[in-house]
Amino acid sequence: DIVAVESPSFPGILQALEVVGLRALEIPTHTAEGLSLEGLELALEQWPVKACVVVCNHSNPMGARMSDERKQQLVSMLAVAGVPLIEDDIYGDLYHSGERPKPARAFDHTGNVIYCSSVSKTISPGLRVGWMLPGRYMANARQHKYFSNLATSSIPQMAVAHFLEQGGYDRYLRFARQNYRQATE
């Protein structure tokens, strides 16, 4: 099966697709606008694309941030085509100007967006704690989670939950955003 991905793309996404026997179809990505919607539209016409993986907010390695209008167009295009959008919003909390950018999922009215995120880029990569809102793909997500690992370590999850409940995550993010803002000025 073919999965549309940003180009350039985070190597880990490409490796993950390869490990499970999927082919990556690279779609050009602009530094300012993110994934080329025109390129994706052409790919959907020419290839049997089964899914699309995108980092809409601060993509890696480009750092592109897709506008809300383009996110709406992306979600709509993929819903019409019947192709699920796998949104990796791992960098969404690390915005450093204005308000937190909306995820593409905010524009999803059909359950076609599978929203994924983690604390691996904000708190610590070693925690290996993430989450997914699979929309209408809940049954498939449960099955894949079950087969990929039967038991997730509860101690890191409990530590992250405590950090969130006590307000530590918000305090840390304010500090991190200030550092990113200063580094980019």
Enumerate the language-model features and the residues they cover.
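Generic structural signal for small/hydrophobic residues in well-ordered secondary structure
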Residues: V3, L17, C52-V53, D88, ...
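Proline-centered loop/turn at the N-terminus of a beta-strand
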Residues: I2, R23, K50, G82-P84, ...
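Conserved core segment of the aminotransferase class I/II
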Residues: H109-R181
